[in-house]
Amino acid sequence: MLLVYDGPALENHKIPVKVLAQSLTALNRIADVANETIFADKSRVSLSVTTFKKGSFGVELVLDSSIFEAVTDILSGKPASAVANGIAIVSCLLEIFALKKWLKGRAITKIDTIPDREQKTIYVGKDSIVVNNTAFVVFQNSSVKRDCAEFVSPLNIEGISSLQLSDTKKVFEQTAVRRKSLQC
């Protein structure tokens, strides 16, 4: 997972530790809630910073599964399980941020479950978006809503104009101009 902050304030590739820590801690808390919702007590995850990217200010993040789980999976012949768990959590995170951004603080007016699929259609008036059931359950957690706002808090700093969180398939991008859509 790659997290990139951009803007004129980052031309020297530096960001205040307090700002970065607050944002990453909020992201880690959301990952914890997603993990607990998806896997209950079967695994534990945490974010780790692996590399810093040149250019704007980028951080490569890895969701680390618990060692116990990894050893159990290897011994039981399921070495790809930890990777699949991480992918499920990252996908859930990206859907949560996309839903929060789409809502723009508007109240949900209707929710339809899509038969034979693990998805819901969320309505605000006539507008709609389809999200994964798990992402919607995690999104409803009040702490996740607060953490979404904290995650985008670097956009409150003058000169930081955007942040982007992505995996190999999906990208979530938020600009400073539109940051209020992720506020509580």
Language model features: what each stretch is:
Residues 1-184:
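Charged, alpha-helical interface segments at or near domain boundaries
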